[in-house]
A protein has these predicted regions:
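A generic secondary-structure boundary signal that marks alpha-helix termini
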Residues: 18-19, 280
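Sec/Tat signal peptide C-region and signal peptidase I cleavage site
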Residues: 24-29
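A residue-level marker of the well-folded mature domains of exported/periplasmic proteins
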Residues: 30-336
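N-terminal secretory signal peptides and thylakoid transit peptides that target proteins
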Residues: 1-17, 23
Length: 336
């Protein structure tokens, strides 16, 4: 019997969830399915952009797919770039991140035969039927990260969040992190800085260093390249750190507790397969659970590093993780 790795299992779970929501079938249309991935950052950021790109690249090995990507797209450029690929006949245009939500609302109605997917929240109750949005449990994972940060803090004084672009998603992730920390361990203060930039490691390092200087002894980021600077500051400041979007253990093997890895590759593949199968369904928001969308990874140690996370802290965290997944902890309520 072939055993599945946790990554494989999570991919299959995600695929099943999307299949149920989009009506994915395994019989694809004979014609070519062209897919383009649009990113505000780069494909080599070690996480958010890279994992989505890896999913896109994996389509090259599947019959009937044509792929393209464009990176480092500014907010002002989004409509023009999206229209360009739609004009070229691409069947699926993926906007990877919050920045694409509103611009796609303007573009999609002009291209009813093109499918659009945004890996971010539904921006308004009614949207065109050819756009699919997604609530990828960002706030749930931020609350969980805050809880774990508080549990593994040695000083039990302060833990910090480093954010990227200044948008509602990042602001609410910061709020959820703070709530998770402060509700989990009494006396711990959650602090956060949204740097306004996803692609500036120097900003991330400076922000994290400031927090560490003010007493924070655990840092978590959700800031792509900017977050790499935060990890560096944690190493130099000899404090604990939590990774995001990918397994970042190798960047700080002695400091990292775990990484919250996002199954972005599976998201891209299964959405593309829905389009290929003719069963893509837009006009809605897909909502996977925390455990469906996120993995806990710590390199060779498994799901956590026992050198930085005690058995007691991990057991408490696991209960919180399961309760969020089961909706017993209502993270959305703490953001109101």
């Amino acid at each position: 019997m072939t055993l599945l790795s946790r990554r494989q299992f999570n991919f299959l779970t995600l695929a099943g969830g999307i299949a149920a929501g989009l009506g994915v079938t395994t019989a694809f249309a004979a014609e070519e399915t062209s897919v383009v991935l649009l990113l505000s950052g780069g494909i080599a950021d070690g996480g958010w952009g890279q994992h989505a790109y890896e999913g896109l690249k994996s389509l090259e090995g599947k019959p009937g797919f044509k792929i393209a990507y464009a990176e480092n797209i500014s907010q002002a450029q989004i409509p023009q770039v999206a229209r360009g690929y739609a004009d070229d006949g691409y069947k699926l245009v993926i906007g990877h991140g919050y920045e694409f939500g509103s611009p796609f609302l303007e573009v999609a109605p002009d291209y009813p035969e093109t499918n659009f997917f945004v890996s971010s929240f539904l921006p308004q109750p009614e949207v065109p039927k050819n756009i699919l949005y997604a609530d990828l449990a960002y706030f749930d994972v931020a609350y969980a990260a805050g809880a774990l940060a508080a549990l593994i803090s040695e000083k039990k004084a302060s833990v910090g969040f480093i954010g990227g672009g200044d948008n509602p998603t990042q602001q609410n992730m910061m709020k959820a992190f703070v709530a998770g920390a402060e509700k989990t361990v009494g006396g711990v203060k959650g602090v956060g800085i949204v740097t306004g930039d996803y692609n500036n490691a120097a900003k991330g390092k400076q922000a994290a260093a400031t927090m560490i200087g003010n007493g924070a002894d655990v840092i978590w980021h959700a800031a792509d390249v900017t977050g790499l600077g935060a990890i560096q500051a944690a190493v130099e400041g000899n404090v604990k750190v939590l990774g995001c979007y990918s397994d970042q253990t190798e960047l700080a093997p002695k400091n990292i507790g775990t990484s919250f890895e996002m199954n972005l590759a599976g998201m891209v593949v299964t959405t593309a397969e829905a389009v290929a199968g003719g069963t893509f369904k837009g006009g809605i928001e897909w909502k996977p659970t925390l455990a469906e969308m996120w993995l806990l990874r710590a390199g060779a140690s498994g799901d956590h590093n026992p050198e930085t996370v005690s058995a007691e802290a991990w057991a408490s965290f696991q209960t919180i993780w399961k309760d969020i997944t089961a909706r017993k902890i209502d993270v959305a309520a703490v953001l109101k």
